[in-house]
Amino acid sequence: MGGWSSKPRKGMGTNLSVPNPLGFFPDHQLDPAFKANSENPDWDLNPHKDNWPDANKVGVGAFGPGFTPPHGGLLGWSPQAQGLLTTVPAAPPPASTNRQSGRQPTPFSPPLRDTHPQAMQWNSTTFLQTLQDSRVRALYLPAGGSSSGTVSPAQNTVSAISSISSKTGDPVPNMENIASGLLGHLLVLQAGFFSLTKILTIPQSLDSWWTSLNFLGGTPACPGQNSQSQISSHSPTCCPPICPGYRWMCLRRFIIFLCILLLCLIFLLVLLDYQGMLPVCPLTPGSTTTSTGPCKTCTTPAQGTSMFPSCCCTKPTDGNCTCIPIPSSWAFAKYLWGWASVRFSWLSLLVPFVQWFVGLSPTVWLSVIWMMWFWGPSLYNILRPFMPLLPTFFCLWVYI
């Protein structure tokens, strides 16, 4: 075994013309050492072998349709011998010489307003009559599974219109509206974040203004620094925690936060009172008490016309309601004054003084003019920290 010999051999494997696909017979070298490589594809060196020309053809064999058993070894070398399925593309049909034959493209249907202008009159009887036409009804009620496009006439007009309404589904969401809505939310979020950053600077600005009152005409400096604390010179509004003035800075900012919350609360109460949600009623003329009882309607109408909300008050004697048009600020001031007078009795002693001060109108006006003249140059610096709150209050006043 191992090479080819010209001497006749006897025994098993002497018929060298028999195909030897698995290499179990002599003189058929399968090992790559015997030139079974890609450089010598015809590695079966037997010159008397049967070339098995039919093996190169694709046919039906034991490996299924389109496969050919391997020849010359375990897999063979040609694509057909390796058992690969070779797909032969089918020849395309000949091109038609008559371009007019076959199905023609469907032409575009003209709009309804051009073919049936009377159908566009929805509020007239002409449309109801036109709807009986099968061609018009086919535009609204297409026949399912029918290629003719004709529809049996409706029994009545009401059922046809109801069928039209029943086939109308939910409207498709408009992407432009969705995008504009998202953009609006993003703008509101950006404006809110900008306002928040500005509002957070209010305590520091007010703290600077507060400390500047103690250093009129000079540069504010922290009085808590000394030679023993080993702290460099700094502003009293930026004291480090180890500075003795740090606790005073925290106290000032806490008071400022309370004042801001009180301002927001006052604005909210004024807004609720303006909307009529606050049960605040002034004293009814000629009476000493007032209440907001279960009276639903006013028996005595309000005198005159006023854009301010009316306050409906009841008299404990007869239970009649009296509507008095009052401004919200006046009602709110009366509410705060009544609430404070109950808890602080000493406020009643200030009433004569306030009445006397209000009666001196020339003096009051002169005092206001003098204060504006004195505080005028620095009035903007005083009110500047409250500027971010003004748009917020305005939006709440308009939209609530």
Curated annotation (Swiss-Prot):
Residues with glycosylation annotation: 320
Swiss-Prot/TrEMBL GO biological process terms: caveolin-mediated endocytosis of virus by host cell; fusion of virus membrane with host endosome membrane; virion attachment to host cell
Residue spans of biased composition, Polar residues class: 96-106
GO cellular component: membrane; viral envelope; virion membrane
Region (Pre-S) location: 2-174
Keywords attached to this entry: Acetylation, Caveolin-mediated endocytosis of virus by host, Fusion of virus membrane with host endosomal membrane, Fusion of virus membrane with host membrane, Glycoprotein, Host-virus interaction, Lipoprotein, Membrane, Myristate, Transmembrane, Transmembrane helix, Viral attachment to host cell, Viral envelope protein, Viral penetration into host cytoplasm, Virion, Virus endocytosis by host, Virus entry into host cell
Posttranslational modification: Isoform M is N-terminally acetylated by host at a ratio of 90%, and N-glycosylated by host at the pre-S2 region.
Lipid-bearing positions (N-myristoyl glycine): 2
Segments for region (Pre-S2): 120-174
UniProt region (Disordered), positions on chain: 1-24, 86-114
Transmembrane segments: 182-202, 254-274, 349-369, 376-398
Spans within the Intravirion topological domain: 2-253, 203-253, 370-375
Keyword Lipoprotein: yes
Coiled coil residues, start to end: none
Compartments, record wording: Virion membrane
Location of region: Pre-S1: 2-119
Biotechnology: Systematic vaccination of individuals at risk of exposure to the virus has been the main method of controlling the morbidity and mortality associated with hepatitis B. The first hepatitis B vaccine was manufactured by the purification and inactivation of HBsAg obtained from the plasma of chronic hepatitis B virus carriers. The vaccine is now produced by recombinant DNA techniques and expression of the S isoform in yeast cells. The pre-S region do not seem to induce strong enough antigenic response.
Family: Belongs to the orthohepadnavirus major surface antigen family.
Assembly mode: Interacts (via its myristoylated pre-S1 region) with the host SLC10A1/NTCP; this interaction is essential for viral entry.
Domain observations: The large envelope protein is synthesized with the pre-S region at the cytosolic side of the endoplasmic reticulum and, hence will be within the virion after budding. Therefore the pre-S region is not N-glycosylated. Later a post-translational translocation of N-terminal pre-S and TM1 domains occur in about 50% of proteins at the virion surface. These molecules change their topology by an unknown mechanism, resulting in exposure of pre-S region at virion surface.
HAMAP family: HBV_HBSAG
Protein name: Large envelope protein
Organism: Hepatitis B virus genotype B2 subtype adw (isolate China/patient4/1996) (HBV-B)
